[in-house]
Amino acid sequence: MLRISGISKTFNIATNNEVRALTNVSLDLEEGSFLIIIGMNGSGKSTLLNAVAGSFLVDSGSINLAGEEITRWPEHRRAKLIGRVFQNPFSGTAPSMSIAENLALAARRGRSRGLGPAVDGSVRSDLRDRVSTLNMGLEDRLENPIGSLSGGQRQALTLLMASWLKPELLLLDEHTAALDPKSADQVIELTQ
């Protein structure tokens, strides 16, 4: 399902700030697998996820996902196949947009978007139903700006958004690290 073959990435090449972030990294992940990458700060865990997500292009090697060679695909194209939740609960959402608008964007990820209304009656009903599965009472607050929510609520919504279209791969980058213990427990429960 995911095959990473010999990828390498060096930042700031030929400068005093040159950093070899990834060197000849390879792994195979079968469909339905769950992989945890453990390492010290600065060891390249987030960099590896960024490489898979397409935040930057790797210097060498290849990345294949669900039978597609995605090594040179831009990030927005990979978004059709990859859902992602960042460590910072404020990174996965647009704070000035409503909960409904954020979710509508997630529901249309990977498709062309026109300038018409993102949330109509049929979409609103689906949003409400899915948000209610979080058991946080947010289904009654769909018009609230997402920026007014707690970190735990935002992270739960980000997880819902990342998994909305059943991605081939879901990347979770220390997705509970910035949360209080109660919120972290709620988000971990949703992850399962």
Regions found by a protein language model. Give the residues of each.
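Q-loop/switch helix immediately C-terminal to the Walker
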Residues: 96-112
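A short, flexible loop at the N-terminus of ABC-type nucleotide-binding domains that lies
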Residues: 1-4, 10-24, 36, 74
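Helix-to-loop junction immediately C-terminal to a conserved catalytic motif
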Residues: 53
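Walker B catalytic motif
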Residues: 174-175
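ABC ATPase NBD coupling module
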Residues: 69-83, 91, 113-120, 124
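ABC ATPase C-loop
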Residues: 162-163
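Conserved ABC transporter NBD signature motif
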Residues: 61-69
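The feature captures the beta-strand-to-loop junction immediately N-terminal to the Walker
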Residues: 38-40
